[in-house]
């Protein structure tokens, strides 16, 4: 009976349940007790969380400068220097703004805080000029979640197609459903020129894939708390939603805007119709980027974007067509260039891949003829190299494959040099 009374009188840790005899120290606080082991565990948790917070703060303090952002873009993207400068400054200011918003309220003076408004980006330029790759590279440098959406797949809510909230779901997925990370991410919306309304004047008929989509995008571009269905698709009752604040998400909206140059030319007094008009030449097409530099909001309105939508995209960057020399540089110079990638694949089969200068020029010319820009280079390389890569694993006698201009044109077979015995595995 005495032992039972003694056991009942033993004090226990309120957290782990161990008695005072099972631990070294038991500290009392009111009707609550905590043992030395639980205190040690709490200290470890606090140190870990403080360490992570300090690491996050350090990362924020190491925001790259515009010159550093542009230099990083140079290692992956050829040319487009004016666009790189504009994007570097815009992205730098955007993430400076986020840091400023995190420190609001920490100042001791009574001066009102200056509110920094978000500046989303509009990119104008032809297909295959590097718009998407520029945005991807920016996200890679900043280590933030990145999502790509195609504006042509979007429709106004209630119609067949994707809701604009599905764009936000893609960003959440890229962030592994970490809401805090997603709210600092970048969303790239391509083909936005394809959702221009059918006429400059408002229509009484519904334009569910044009003006309707622009209207639906307005709120998420400016900043709103959106309800995202975790599984995607349409919203329905009794469904759980993820709340995502888009205020600090950077939107980069892009399109080729074919025909916009005519709108700008008309405004500048250059006639686009009539027998006396000169036929557009390749040289003039190459100078489209110079015309785009003169774009005004009124030109975009005439093209088919609504004024409210344009107002959410204050930063405008233009990218130009890539000429032959630029495309050859795209093939060879970037850190992950196509030539370097295919050389690595051939190395895995114990062979050296060599391109002559005229081969690279021919590949660039084919991309220009197809009007696919840098985007079409991989398809051309595949057409040339697939037959070789099919046979190469069975050809242990081949040590080097040489691609010249005739091979690139499909007029000759590649030159295959015999492997040196020490260099080729059996």
UniProtKB/Swiss-Prot annotation:
Pfam assignment, any one? zf-C4_ClpX
Where the record annotates domain ClpX-type ZB, the positions are: 1-54
List where this protein forms a coiled coil: none
Binding of ATP occurs at 126-133
Mention any one GO cellular component term assigned to this protein in its UniProt record.
HslUV protease complex
Q: What does this protein do?
A: ATP-dependent specificity component of the Clp protease. It directs the protease to specific substrates. Can perform chaperone functions in the absence of ClpP.
Family designation:
Belongs to the ClpX chaperone family.
Give the protein name, as stated in the record: ATP-dependent Clp protease ATP-binding subunit ClpX
Organism encoding this protein:
Corynebacterium glutamicum (strain ATCC 13032 / DSM 20300 / JCM 1318 / BCRC 11384 / CCUG 27702 / LMG 3730 / NBRC 12168 / NCIMB 10025 / NRRL B-2784 / 534)
């Amino acid at each position: 009976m005495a032992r039972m009374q003694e056991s009942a009188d033993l004090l226990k840790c309120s957290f782990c349940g161990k008695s005072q005899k099972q631990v070294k120290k038991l500290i009392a606080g009111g009707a609550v007790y905590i043992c030395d082991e639980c205190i040690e565990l709490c200290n470890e948790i606090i140190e870990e969380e403080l360490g992570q917070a300090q690491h996050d703060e350090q990362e924020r303090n190491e925001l790259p400068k515009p010159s550093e952002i542009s230099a990083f873009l140079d290692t992956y993207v050829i040319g487009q220097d004016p666009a790189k400068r504009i994007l570097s400054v815009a992205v730098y200011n955007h993430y400076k703004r986020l840091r400023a918003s995190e420190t609001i309220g920490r100042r001791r003076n009574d001066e009102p805080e200056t509110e920094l408004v978000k500046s989303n980006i509009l990119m104008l330029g032809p297909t295959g000029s590097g718009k998407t790759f520029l945005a991807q590279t920016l996200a890679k440098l900043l280590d933030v979640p990145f999502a790509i959406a195609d504006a042509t797949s979007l429709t106004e809510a209630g119609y067949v197609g994707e809701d604009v909230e599905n764009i936000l779901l893609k960003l959440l997925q890229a962030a592994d459903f970490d809401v805090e990370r997603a709210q600092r991410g970048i969303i790239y919306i391509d083909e936005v020129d394809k959702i221009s309304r059918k006429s400059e004047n408002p229509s009484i008929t519904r334009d569910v894939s044009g003006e309707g989509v622009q209207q639906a995008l307005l709120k998420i571009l400016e900043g709103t708390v959106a309800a995202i269905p975790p599984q995607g698709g349409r919203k329905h009752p009794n469904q759980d939603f993820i709340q995502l604040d888009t205020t600090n998400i950077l939107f980069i909206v892009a399109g080729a805007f074919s025909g916009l140059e005519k709108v700008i030319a008309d405004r500048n007094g250059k006639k686009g119709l009539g027998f006396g008009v000169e036929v557009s030449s390749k040289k003039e097409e190459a100078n489209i980027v110079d015309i785009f530099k003169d774009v005004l909001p009124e030109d975009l309105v005439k093209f088919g974007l609504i004024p409210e939508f344009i107002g959410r995209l204050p930063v405008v960057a233009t990218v130009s067509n890539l000429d032959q020399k630029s495309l050859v540089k795209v093939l060879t110079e970037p850190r992950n260039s196509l030539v370097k990638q295919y050389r690595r694949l051939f190395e895995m089969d114990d062979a050296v891949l060599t391109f002559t200068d005229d081969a690279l020029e021919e590949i660039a010319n084919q991309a220009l003829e197809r009007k696919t820009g840098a985007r079409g280079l991989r398809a051309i390389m595949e057409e040339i190299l697939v037959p070789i890569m099919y046979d190469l694993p069975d050809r242990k006698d081949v040590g080097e494959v040489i691609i010249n201009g005739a091979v690139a044109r499909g007029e000759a077979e590649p030159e295959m040099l015999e492997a040196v015995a020490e260099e080729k595995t059996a």
